[in-house]
Amino acid sequence: MIDLSAPAIEVAPLLLGATIWRGPVGIRLTEVEAYMGLDDPASHAFRGPTPRARVMFGPPSHIYVYLSYGMHRCVNLVCSPDGEASAVLLRGGQVIAGHDDARRRRGNVAENRLACGPGNMGSALGASLEESGNPVSIIGNGAISALGWRLEPAPEIAEFRQGPRVGISRNIDAPWRWWIPQDPTVSGPRT
């Protein structure tokens, strides 16, 4: 079982191979990054609970959606105990269910690009800014409902690599990016 009340740096590698669900769309996670709140200059929560980052301060097991470059909706899972800020950015994954919905949202792109990169992930899932702060249910046994955000843990921990995050300008050396090596849905370096 994944415990989202743990810090993001502990949760992130456990998410590889897990499936995030929103409605009928399911995406197997292949790349994630941790952001550690007040201790991480690259985190939106670094300056405290601003209106944008307030949801990162808990409670855990909620979605944090933000707009990147004014157009990309990026999805994070809020972690850590209530009052402490950390979140895992969902950077890449493989669409395993709801292909028609994901394809309608993403257009005519290669299958491995449907949810490759955090903005594409948010688009494939159909995430909206209004959903920021909505709860995430952790499910098992393949049971899904048509509503809400759900996280289905991987049947086993995936082999992974760890290294620096990508696309940031602060705290760039923190090794808080995890990915499944050689997976074509990983957006950053794959080796």
UniProtKB/Swiss-Prot annotation:
It comes from the Bacteria. NCBIfam families: 3mg, PRK00802.1-3. It holds the Pfam family Pur_DNA_glyco. Keywords: DNA damage, DNA repair, Hydrolase. Its EC number is 3.2.2.-. It comes from Cutibacterium acnes (strain DSM 16379 / KPA171202). This is Putative 3-methyladenine DNA glycosylase. GO terms for biological process: base-excision repair. One of its GO terms (molecular function) is alkylbase DNA N-glycosylase activity.
